[in-house]
């Protein structure tokens, strides 16, 4: 196509092919497919789950030495995550299946005493024989390659008035030894884990959540296709593509078409934790967060935005691709936090 016809030769395609198919997520609870290998010198959970409450703005001292505003106060938008402690109701051992190379569960241990609210999502046994389950762990621990904690959220401690918990698997990492991971998992059985036991303020995390659902949308909003001129030769439409493809093949899946927009699982890498607190009253507006409520207990402040609507479950994970020039690991100096939600 020549320049005389008014088109750029190198115009990129509309919309990314890297996020196909653009359909609704299978579950509102994020499914994490990749976990990093981290060496911290001590065992720890590699992730945490929290509820998105809203956004605020905070005055923070810029601590990046390469920034022209280094040492000065800057205003940053922050997302508030309501982070009640996670309940550890069990753990699993995984080995590699020799036939296909996938991980396969070989042993599972449950906590001896389980809270009643787990009955909403689990069929609880009358009695848990921990000794019998631990014998199976001892039998298979030599071939185990992964240890994962079975955790349940505690939404009744959050501000959303919900009772049914979400169940997740979070790997235990930080040390290469499987024995140390198993001992750590046993020590957590029947206990709760707070966000301060997993992350520290100043570090980077990956944020995984299901985005806001927009329903069925056209190509203008869904792909950013250019609106056609509104004159008589475009009488067949303006908010549409000029062509949906050639005569053959009959359907070009790469062509922008109307369809589902939003409610997709997305991952945003290397978000910085500004602050982790224990008292949600410190950051909750007087009238509560709009469409959420009151943050009662532990909370996490994330710099910038986070996918999803208010009340949505967000999974935080140790970064799988940390930048070569990471920001300072020290806790940022927060001067002031607004009391008015965005």
Curated annotation (Swiss-Prot):
Gene3D superfamilies from the UniProt entry: 3.30.1430.10, Ribosomal protein L3, domain 3, Translation factors
UniProt KW keywords: Ribonucleoprotein, Ribosomal protein, RNA-binding, rRNA-binding
InterPro entries: L3_arc_euk, Ribosomal_L3_dom_3_arc_sf, Ribosomal_uL3, Ribosomal_uL3_arc, Ribosomal_uL3_CS, Transl_B-barrel_sf
This protein's record includes keyword Secreted: no
Quaternary structure note: Part of the 50S ribosomal subunit. Forms a cluster with proteins L14 and L24e.
Family as reported in the entry's similarity comment: Belongs to the universal ribosomal protein uL3 family.
Function: One of the primary rRNA binding proteins, it binds directly near the 3'-end of the 23S rRNA, where it nucleates assembly of the 50S subunit.
Protein name (database record): Large ribosomal subunit protein uL3
Organism name: Pyrobaculum islandicum (strain DSM 4184 / JCM 9189 / GEO3)
């Amino acid at each position: 196509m020549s320049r005389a016809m008014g088109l750029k030769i190198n115009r990129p395609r509309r919309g990314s092919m890297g996020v196909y198919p653009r359909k609704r997520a299978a579950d509102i609870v994020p499914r994490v497919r990749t976990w990093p290998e981290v060496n911290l010198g001590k065992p720890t959970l590699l992730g945490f789950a929290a509820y998105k409450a809203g956004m605020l703005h905070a005055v923070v001292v810029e601590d990046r030495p390469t920034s022209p505003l280094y040492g000065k106060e800057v205003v940053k938008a922050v997302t508030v995550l309501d982070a009640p402690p996670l309940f550890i109701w069990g753990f699993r051992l995984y080995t590699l299946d020799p036939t296909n190379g996938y991980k396969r569960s070989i042993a599972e241990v449950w906590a001896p005493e389980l809270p009643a609210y787990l009955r909403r999502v689990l069929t609880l046994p009358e009695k848990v024989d921990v000794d019998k389950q631990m014998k199976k762990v001892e039998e298979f621990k030599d071939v185990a390659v992964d240890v994962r904690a079975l955790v349940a959220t505690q939404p009744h401690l959050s501000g959303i008035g919900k009772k049914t918990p979400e169940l997740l698997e979070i790997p235990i990492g930080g040390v290469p030894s499987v024995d140390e991971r198993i001992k750590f998992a046993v020590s957590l059985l029947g206990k709760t884990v707070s966000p301060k036991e997993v992350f520290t303020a100043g570090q980077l995390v990956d944020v995984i959540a299901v985005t806001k659902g927009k329903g069925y949308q056209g190509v203008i909003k869904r792909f950013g296709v250019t609106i056609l001129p509104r004159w008589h030769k475009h009488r067949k439409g303006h908010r549409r593509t000029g062509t949906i493809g050639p005569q053959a093949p009959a359907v070009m899946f790469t062509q922008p078409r109307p369809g589902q927009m939003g409610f997709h699982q997305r991952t945003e890498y290397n978000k910085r934790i500004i602050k982790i607190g224990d008292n949600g009253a410190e950051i909750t507006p007087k009238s509560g967060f709009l469409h959420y409520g009151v943050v009662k207990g532990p909370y996490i402040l994330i710099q910038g935005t986070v996918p999803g609507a208010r009340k949505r479950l967000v999974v935080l994970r140790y970064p799988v691709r940390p930048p070569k020039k990471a920001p300072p690991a020290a806790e940022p100096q927060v001067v002031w936090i607004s009391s008015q939600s965005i």
